[in-house]
Regions:
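Adenosine-phosphate binding glycine-rich loop
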Residues: 2-25, 220-221, 335-446
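Phosphate-interaction motifs
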Residues: 61-122, 126, 130
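Rossmann-like adenosine-cofactor binding region
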Residues: 264-365, 370
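Glycine/serine-rich phosphate-binding loop and adjoining beta1-alpha1 elements at the start
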Residues: 96, 115-229
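Glycine-rich phosphate/diphosphate-binding loop of Rossmann-like nucleotide-binding domains
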Residues: 193-196, 201-311
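Structured beta-strand/loop patches that form or line metal/cofactor-binding pockets in enzymes
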Residues: 42-73
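General beta-strand structural signal in soluble alpha/beta enzymes
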Residues: 160-164, 187-192, 235, 258-261, ...
Length: 446
């Protein structure tokens, strides 16, 4: 078995050299899915996984725009259309200087499995640019988004490819992108998700990823007749996912001790309550300031510069910042301090070594493709509402989100249950693979 896995990874690596993030994602899937493929005659010999790791389409383009000093700037734009076996391509756009082909291919590959897990008819894709919205004026961001969409619009559509937000792409950017698409196509359609509620968006969409990861963690705890009430939680990040994960943790009776950004983390031993969270939301979403400002208002809290929160004693850890933020040493620190549950809010925030340590010690660990699928799930519900030309209430959408996260958890249990442990990595990978693979087999070699 080891030889088959090694041979497969060698072949994929040969085709995708110098793409470490993508290979990391493929390796994690291959190690759990290939043994399953070999055990099933229907999949063995069909090269399905090899077909799944190859994008159906890779789009790369120049994005030229004019800054406030009337100087011409040039960035790169991308869209990876990974797999459309179960539905149109669906996945976010990321605007960040680190964006490259490897990162977007890893995100698109993960998205295929994540979208399959939601049970909604969505394929997988991802896109973005190395443009950095930080420090840019609203007008500069608008000009960039308009230039970006002027090329992207020809590749997307409500039944073809439906982008959404990601790091660096929030409500403001989605608005500018949608406005330009509407101008170019002269039509109002559900081509993007994450829209404002007054112009085709869904209630609960901004909260969905954060809420969803907490719902999933609660499902994990329920396996052992436990719950979130009274638990201490360390959360990284302070963007959309971290904010709403914090909000839902508070709703369910947990105590959130930390939040962070690229400058460091805050530790509030009294817990971040609703009032403090509102201040953080204003600080990050409106003023766009650093998390360190928090300790100026709440002097009992501590700010630790250039560090992450994984040395803090907690029951539950929810990494919500970015890929590979939690490494082996961080994982050791969490285990030493009594952490029993880790649920990924970001995409692949734990390194392979960290994940292996969690699995070896049999703590409850949820990979992002399962635990943070709430965002794309509600994106799918937004697409459904756009098709119906109808808006569901907050309660209806939240109820559907809870149900989807519960169904994802059940799928992980079905395929990931071992003798005395649930391997959620194995469960999520196999469950996602089976849905996509069955569709690919039915559609022939295309």
């Amino acid at each position: 078995m080891e030889k088959i896995i090694k041979q497969f990874l060698s072949e994929v690596n040969q085709r995708n050299q110098n793409e470490p993030e993508f290979m990391q994602a493929v390796t994690e899937v291959a190690e759990t899915v290939i043994p399953y493929i070999v055990s099933k005659d229907i999949y063995y010999g069909q090269n399905i996984l090899l077909r799944m790791v190859e994008p159906e389409r890779v789009i790369s383009f120049r994005v030229a725009w004019i800054d406030d000093n009337e100087e011409i700037q040039v960035n790169r734009g991308y869209r990876i259309e990974m797999n459309s076996a179960i539905g149109p391509y669906k996945g976010g756009l990321r605007f960040h200087p680190s964006v490259n082909m490897s990162i977007l291919k890893f995100l698109a590959f993960e998205q295929v499995f994540k979208n399959a897990l939601t049970t909604l008819p969505m394929g997988g894709g991802k896109g973005g640019s190395d443009f950095d919205p930080k420090g840019k004026s609203d007008t500069e961001v608008m000009r960039f988004c308009q230039s970006f969409m002027t090329e992207l619009f020809r590749h997307i559509g409500p039944n073809k490819d439906i982008p959404a937000g990601d790091i660096g792409v929030g409500g403001r950017e989605i608005g500018y992108l949608f406005g330009q698409y509407k101008r170019l196509k002269n039509e109002f359609s559900g081509v993007l998700t994450g829209k404002g509620v007054s112009w085709g968006g869904s209630l609960i969409r901004p909260e969905a990823t954060g809420y969803g990861v907490v719902y999933f963690i609660d499902e994990m705890l329920n396996v052992n007749n436990d719950g979130l009430k009274g638990k201490s939680v360390a959360i990284s990040g302070s963007g959309n996912v971290a904010q709403y994960a914090t909000e839902k943790c508070l709703d369910m009776g947990a105590k959130v001790l930390t939040l962070s950004d690229s400058s460091g983390y805050i530790y509030d031993k009294d817990g971040i309550n609703k009032e403090k969270l509102q201040y953080i939301m204003e600080l990050k979403n409106v003023k766009r300031k650093r998390i360190s400002e928090y300790v100026k208002k709440y002097s009992k809290a501590e700010f630790h510069s250039d560090k992450n929160p994984w040395s803090v004693k907690c029951d539950i850890a929810i990494p919500c910042a970015t890929q590979n933020e939690l490494n082996l040493n961080d994982a050791k620190a969490l285990l030493k301090n009594g952490c029993k549950t880790v649920g990924e809010g970001a995409n692949m925030p734990c390194t392979a070594d960290a994940i292996n340590l969690f699995l070896k010690n049999k703590i409850q660990y949820a990979p992002g493709k399962a635990s943070n699928a709430g965002g794309v799930a509600v994106s799918g519900l937004e697409m459904a509402q756009n098709s119906l030309k109808y808006t569901w209430s907050r309660e209806v959408v939240d109820g559907k989100l809870k149900e989807i996260m519960s169904d994802i958890h059940s799928s992980c249990i079905k395929y990931g249950s071992e003798k005395d442990y649930v391997n959620y990595v194995k469960g999520a990978n196999i469950a996602g693979f089976v849905k996509v693979a069955d569709a690919m087999l039915a559609q022939g070699v295309v």
